[in-house]
Amino acid sequence: MTCGSGFCGRAFSCASACGPRPGRCCISAAPYRGISCYRGLSGGFGSQSVCGAFRSGSCGRSFGYRSGGICGPSPPCITTVSVNESLLTPLNLEIDPNAQCVKHEEKEQIKCLNSKFAAFIDKVRFLEQQNKLLETKWQFYQNRKCCESNMEPLFEGYIEALRREAECVEADSGRLAAELNHAQESMEGYKKRYEEEVSLRATAENEFVALKKDVDCAYLRKSDLEANAEALTQETDFLRRMYDEETRILHSHISDTSIVVKMDNSRDLNMDCVVAEIKAQYDDIASRSRAEAESWYRTKCEEIKATVIRHGETLRRTREEINELNRMIQRLTAEIENAKCQNTKLEAAVTQSEQQGEAALADARCKLAELEGALQKAKQDMACLLKEYQEVMNSKLGLDVEITTYRRLLEGEEQRLCEGVGAVNVCVSSSRGGVVCGDLCVSGSRPVIGSACSAPCSGNLAVNTGLCAPCGSAVSCGRKC
């Protein structure tokens, strides 16, 4: 008997509160998480608490049946079951407020674990595919036949490329050296021009100082001339006033003085004419003096003005030249700084190019030395192989000669056997001695028994036939002919 799912969606078992009935098995309907229906109660209760006396036959957490227990076939007799009365009391079943949250968290954890499990499965499949791919590649590489490649053309091409690169580096080094020389020459020219402009500036400054002194002298002279002109004007005014005063006094004396003159009636003296003539002379002298003073003053003023204008124009031209020289000096200074920067950059580039060229040349030399060593070793190996090949060919030639000799001997022996000739001993002669025989050799000489044949032989040991290979003489078995 189970309760519904109204308590937070969890099912709990009440079958533990009732005892087992005959002919029935106890089936637990507890949730999969545990045996407690309410997580807040300590200890809780479940389906196994009541059926503790029938533990051997109780059902598990997965609603399974075990043979030989309560859930299996009923035995012929049922034993008495003792039940704890305290378990029959009503239970205080309450809804856990955190049960929904816990259930939601468990669902989220299950989803996360399912996602991870799916990711692991995908990863395992991917790794299996990669493993199969690698196994296929491994089998392909194992089944592929190894072919010998001649590396000498590759090394020669690489050496040629390194040589061309070294030549390009040398050409670039020469070009950069020429550019550096040109830049140095340009810098020397700019330096000379700068020194010339500095000397011209010093000369212009000296001329400016001299002209300034001349202008100061002219200004002082002008001031002196103005002071002199003013003094002369004052003196002229004073003389004019003095002349007027003297004339007035003279007229007053003449008009107030009565002079008794004894006159000679024989002559007539007109004093008015004499006075008028003297007055006219004085007036003429005064006017000429005034005109001369004014003309001299005007001339001097014009000269001073012309001198001032000329010196002002010269000063203006000198200032313009000084400003132009300053601008030229600034421009030349900037050009010199730019030339210095370019020279520094070119020197750094040349140094870097030299270092790179030296490194490339050193690397090329090392690789060339390695290639030469490898080539020399290959030549030595080839010479050894040729020597071994020559030795093998010599051995083969000797074996061919021996095989031919044996074939001829066998053919001759067959012919003798066919003709009925007795058995003869065959020996293989040595190149260093003759044959030991008692019969005639092929050469026609009869050697002494136990001595060497004088005829040249092939150098082999005697065989069981008892005949010498070149001469057909009989020798003992196992001895040298």
Swiss-Prot record:
Gene3D superfamilies: 1.20.5.170, Single helix bin, Vasodilator-stimulated phosphoprotein. There is a cross-link at residue 212 (Glycyl lysine isopeptide (Lys-Gly) (interchain with G-Cter in SUMO1)). Residues 142-151 are annotated as: Linker 1. Residues 270-413 are annotated as: Coil 2. Residues 253-269 are annotated as: Linker 12. The keyword Ligase does not apply. Residues 414-481 are annotated as: Tail. Expressed in dorsal skin. Residues 106-417 form the IF rod domain. PANTHER family: GATA-TYPE DOMAIN-CONTAINING PROTEIN, KERATIN, TYPE II CUTICULAR HB3. There are two types of hair/microfibrillar keratin, I (acidic) and II (neutral to basic). Belongs to the intermediate filament family. Heterotetramer of two type I and two type II keratins. This is Keratin, type II cuticular Hb1. It comes from Mus musculus.
